[in-house]
């Protein structure tokens, strides 16, 4: 479920103005108790919400807070920084990286990154799925079974 965080959002309730124009008041107590509210709850920010069968939130992701430049030390030698830029409208670009990022989106509470691996025999687009572990003002941690990334925001 996607929408905008409303001004009536409180500690345990998210007011979500959905992309369809409906206004919903969603309990986020379960998500908050399980540390599954990522990026904070700021009015007018774009949000993604994964709902339980009882319409309470399992996971809440502040999409607006994901936007920006995210870098980490190069895992090969640590001497340089690499990463990605997450932009509006699902656009992703690379920062000094061996992969060329193309797109990003949140689907079922996961971050999907589409990229092309430069210099490989296969120049087809690949999609990697990541679990968001943390999202703060200056940090983003994502992981899947094959890799873990701890990014810092580059201003």
Predicted region positions:
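N-terminal glycine/threonine-rich, aromatic-flanked beta-hairpin/loop signature
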Residues: 1, 77-112, 116-123
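Structural detector for short beta-strands of small beta-barrel domains
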Residues: 1-13
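An anionic, turn-rich surface loop/hairpin at beta-sheet edges
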Residues: 26-31, 110-134
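Beta-strand/loop nucleic-acid-binding surfaces
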Residues: 21-38
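Tryptophan-anchored aromatic micro-motifs
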Residues: 62-79
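Short nucleic-acid-contacting surface segments enriched for D/E, G, S/T with interspersed K/R
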Residues: 33-49
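Short, charged beta-turn/beta-strand-edge "cap" motif at the junction between a beta-strand
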Residues: 8-11, 50-57
